[in-house]
């Protein structure tokens, strides 16, 4: 692991607080976000570079990979989304192999994948990261206030919460003083490449290099289409149930992420990558499908990405709560949703034969 993190943690509480406050002022974000980002980066270092975390390969994905891995979104991303390589927990399974199975055999196989991932996350990984955290805190003279525990709200029992020791003042309730390591073994693995991530405070410490290398990160083109599938599912869920899935909590970020990606070359290239689109939808149908998502309709001609009018009020509330995580100028949600609607029109202007 990068010894620079220990150098920072060995400083006094006052010095660490000043570091986080100063970086927050420079970036236009809360000091609590900067502190949490520091621990997000430490956690990524522990997951991908710690000598004690031997085991199956991991893949970094989701919104945090867009911000930390590629700098494509200007949103503080507070949690870590990782996928365990299935074959390395004894569960090799491609979409093609699963499609060839009967319904009962397929269900049993998917359950086996889930159970194997649960065992690894709540056993080996929990033990390894707990040991690394304890060793880091002991070596830097910080009281053992941090801890790692299973997330009691995860019904799949595949997520962990890392409660880190804090030196900043309490912030708003939207930013929890814990990093959620959201895990699973069902996500697509390709394309990916090794990446380097850095905490925000790296720019404030020229005498240190806080780079975290070797972070195997999914390509942003897949993340873009994964987000598109999520938006389609959110809208279809509303159409079927007349409610915003999850009560609209922490979902506006998906609309923002798509908006930001569309403003980047990587996003525009992803829009044209219809092979990736089909692969993402096919994968989601196999591993994450719910009837109310209507993923069979997530094809050119029938994508539904723009929210129903009845969804917008809840999305506005969630977006306002989330806006403190955005650096610099905050895009108006009307502009965000308009861009999503334009994307829907663009995708549906192409027939299946032309896609």
What is each model feature region?
Residues 1-58, 70-74, 84-355:
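Structured mid-to-C-terminal alpha-helical surface segments
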Residues 60-64:
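Glycine-rich beta-strand-to-loop/alpha-helix junction loops that act as flexible
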Residues 67:
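Betabetaalpha-Me/HNH-type nuclease active-site subdomain
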């Amino acid at each position: 692991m990068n010894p620079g993190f220990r150098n920072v943690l060995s400083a006094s509480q006052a010095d660490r607080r000043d570091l986080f406050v100063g970086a927050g002022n420079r970036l236009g974000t809360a000091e609590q976000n900067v502190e949490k980002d520091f621990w997000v980066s430490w956690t990524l270092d522990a997951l991908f570079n710690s000598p004690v975390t031997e085991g199956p390969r991991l893949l970094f994905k989701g919104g945090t990979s867009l911000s930390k891995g590629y700098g494509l979104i200007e949103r503080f991303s507070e949690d870590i989304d990782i996928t365990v390589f299935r074959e390395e927990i004894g569960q090799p399974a491609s979409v093609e192999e699963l499609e060839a199975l009967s319904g009962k055999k397929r269900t049993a196989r998917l359950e086996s994948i889930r159970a194997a991932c649960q065992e690894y996350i709540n056993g080996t990984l929990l033990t390894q990261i707990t040991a690394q955290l304890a060793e880091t805190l002991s070596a830097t003279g910080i009281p053992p206030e941090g801890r790692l525990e299973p997330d009691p709200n995860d019904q799949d029992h595949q997520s962990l919460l890392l409660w880190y020791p804090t030196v900043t003042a309490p912030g708003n309730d939207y930013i929890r003083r814990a990093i959620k390591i959201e895990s699973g073994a069902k996500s697509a693995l390709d394309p990916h490449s090794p990446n380097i991530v850095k905490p925000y405070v790296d720019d404030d410490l020229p005498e240190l290099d806080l780079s975290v290398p070797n972070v195997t990160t999914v390509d942003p083109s897949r993340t873009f289409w994964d987000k598109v599938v999520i938006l389609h599912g959110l809208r279809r869920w509303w159409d079927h149930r007349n409610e915003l899935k999850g009560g609209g909590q922490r979902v506006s970020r998906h609309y923002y992420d798509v908006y930001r990606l569309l403003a980047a070359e990587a996003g525009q290239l992803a829009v044209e990558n219809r092979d990736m689109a089909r692969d993402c939808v096919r994968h989601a149908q196999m591993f994450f499908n719910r009837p109310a998502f209507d993923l069979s309709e997530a094809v050119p001609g029938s994508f539904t990405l723009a929210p129903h009018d009845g969804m917008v009020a809840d999305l506005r509330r969630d977006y306002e709560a989330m806006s403190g995580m955005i650096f610099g100028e905050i895009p108006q949600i009307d502009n965000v949703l308009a861009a999503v609607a334009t994307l829907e029109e663009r995708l549906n202007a192409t027939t299946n034969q032309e896609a």
